[in-house]
Amino acid sequence: MGGSREFRAEEHSNQFHSIIAMAIWLGAIHFNVALVLCSLIFLPPSLSLMVLGLLSLFIFIPIDHRSKYGRKLARYICKHACNYFPVSLYVEDYEAFQPNRAYVFGYEPHSVLPIGVVALCDLTGFMPIPNIKVLASSAIFYTPFLRHIWTWLGLTAASRKNFTSLLDSGYSCVLVPGGVQETFHMQHDAENVFLSRRRGFVRIAMEQGSPLVPVFCFGQARVYKWWKPDCDLYLKLSRAIRFTPICFWGVFGSPLPCRQPMHVVVGKPIEVTKTLKPTDEEIAKFHGQYVEALRDLFERHKSRVGYDLELKIL
């Protein structure tokens, strides 16, 4: 791997700033839940309704994507969050990436939250690609406060329209192909990635002529403890709301994740044949190449990073 390169974040921050950055980045979900519960329990009905009304207002307030203060906050998070775990990024063939091309990064696994993607954000500055967007569940963008912070970090709703438009505009896109259903299939003793029937991202990559890039994050499954129901109704609900309700917690039951090292590994780009209307056979061919490349990536690096979980491709 002569063109490989590794980036580490241990010297980018001190512990105080890394904790503050993590709290701002990931604390909004728990903050919203705590605010609603406290208002319902401790406030009179009129004030509780006012709190709920204000939260609803934050769902619909337009977001300035280029906000000076928003982007400054996002830079702060990207600079210091990688140090918290810490997160490292290993690129197998750094020189294979061209700054003027748009790539489709298939990031796995989803875990509770795919927070290792911070290593791929353009504001982190590890990858030699100037324009990167992360596609995320649309439910995030209906969550007060979280939608603002994550938009400034470079996340956008995962839709075919957004995906195609971004690639067409020269943006590389990071997505988790397994999505909501992968979260439903999580196990504590294995890495389950839901890929066998996930081919839409390959179709769009072929339509745009964008190379597929396998990415795996080792250690992400261990940064949160979690519990979820095990029933068909739960799966149907998750699909309906395009989000997986799950009980998760970190340090002392807080939203701060446990400090476990994460190793994000980026494989070599897989060139695809550009075609406006790819056939099912053509899609299956490149989908198979991506799945095999992801499996090989996992096997090549699991011993290097000391990972003992088994990879299961569902």
Swiss-Prot record:
This is Diacylglycerol O-acyltransferase 2. Pathway: Glycerolipid metabolism; triacylglycerol biosynthesis. Its EC number is 2.3.1.20. Ubiquitous. Lower levels in seeds than in other tissues. Expressed in embryo and root meristematic cells. Disruption phenotype: No decrease in oil content. Its main location: endoplasmic reticulum. Disulfide bonds: none annotated. It catalyses: an acyl-CoA + a 1,2-diacyl-sn-glycerol = a triacyl-sn-glycerol + CoA; 1,2-dihexanoyl-sn-glycerol + (9Z)-octadecenoyl-CoA = 1,2-dihexanoyl-3-(9Z-octadecenoyl)-sn-glycerol + CoA. Belongs to the diacylglycerol acyltransferase family. The keyword Transmembrane applies. Pfam families: DAGAT (PF03982). Signal peptide: none annotated.
